């Protein structure tokens, strides 16, 4: 188990609401993981921890330094995947379409001027905006602004700024379908791309943007529908973009790659 402070503890139960702290775990560079003087027998590590420290390259780097066999993406590709703007720059260099975006620096997030930033955002992206942290996941700190005004814009930027130094202001795509793909790397370094699967949200009886609550907090949670029901040409384009994106950020092992579809337009989201 990993505490919010980043401390590791060996657990006796597979699943528990409470963390037992009597057996702290330490990583030794080049040697592995230890509880006291006892080395833990680790066959492989699946870095499935969400958010900061877990999927941003930090945990991956620790595993590599401790010489623990790591499944999935390494430090570089994990960091790129978490930092949305950096990833989009790489994707665009490979002619993969992404959502039109304006990046707000730390100073702008803190001090504005928000009236000028709103005018700039609406001029570039339109009246409806989507605001999110630049390096976060699970829809944390995200706001949708239909017909955005100064107060709602400032509130959204400040909220996203709680989770990231930089904030992304994006064009709010609508109508919108959200689809997901999965990429698996084979032993001979080939790629198998599965999907796309259509995200269905029964709570709202529609298909679209997945909030944090819909992902984790509801009984009738969103689910994936396969086959997606999209036109074959759209599906084939999505699968090809997913393959190119995986290679572009030097991903390894496996990855989930998400897209937005609006009419015949495709956007790689994350």
Describe each model-derived feature in a short phrase.
Residues 50-51, 139, 201-205:
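Glycine-rich phosphate/pyrophosphate-binding beta-alpha loops
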Residues 246-270:
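Conserved metal-phosphate-binding beta-hairpin within the catalytic cores
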Residues 1-76, 80-86, 104-117:
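ATP-binding N-terminal substructure of ATP-dependent carboxylate-amine bond-forming enzymes
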Residues 35, 39, 79-176, 186-188, ...:
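Active-site nucleotide/adenylate-binding loops and adjacent lid/helix of ATP-dependent enzymes
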Residues 70-74, 100-103, 133, 270:
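Short beta-strands and strand-loop turn motifs
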Residues 150-240, 261, 266-267:
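Phosphate-binding site of ATP-dependent enzymes
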């Amino acid at each position: 188990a990993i505490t919010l402070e980043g401390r590791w503890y060996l657990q006796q139960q597979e699943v528990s609401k409470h963390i037992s702290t009597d057996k702290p775990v330490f990583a030794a560079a080049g040697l592995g993981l230890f509880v006291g003087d006892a080395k833990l027998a680790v066959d492989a590590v699946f870095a499935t921890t969400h958010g900061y420290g877990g999927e941003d390259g930090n945990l991956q780097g620790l595993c590599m330094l401790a010489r623990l066999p790591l499944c999935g993406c390494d430090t570089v590709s994990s960091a790129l995947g978490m930092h949305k703007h950096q990833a989009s720059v790489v994707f665009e260099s490979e002619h993969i379409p992404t959502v039109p975006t304006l990046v707000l620096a730390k100073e702008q997030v803190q001090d504005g001027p928000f009236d000028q930033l709103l005018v700039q955002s609406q001029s570039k992206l339109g009246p409806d905006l989507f605001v999110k942290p630049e390096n976060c996941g699970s829809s944390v700190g995200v706001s949708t602004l239909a017909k955005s005004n100064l107060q709602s814009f400032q509130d959204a930027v400040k909220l996203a700024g709680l989770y990231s130094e930089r904030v992304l202001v994006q064009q709010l795509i609508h109508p919108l379908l959200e689809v997901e793909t999965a990429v698996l790397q084979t032993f001979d370094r080939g790629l198998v791309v599965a999907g796309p699967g259509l995200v269905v949200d029964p709570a709202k009886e529609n298909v679209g943007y997945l909030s944090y609550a819909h992902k984790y907090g509801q009984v009738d949670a969103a689910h994936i529908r396969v086959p997606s029901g999209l036109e074959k040409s759209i599906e084939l384009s999505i699968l090809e973009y997913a393959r190119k994106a995986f290679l572009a950020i030097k991903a390894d092992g496996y990855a989930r790659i998400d897209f937005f579809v609006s009419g015949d337009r495709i956007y790689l989201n994350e």
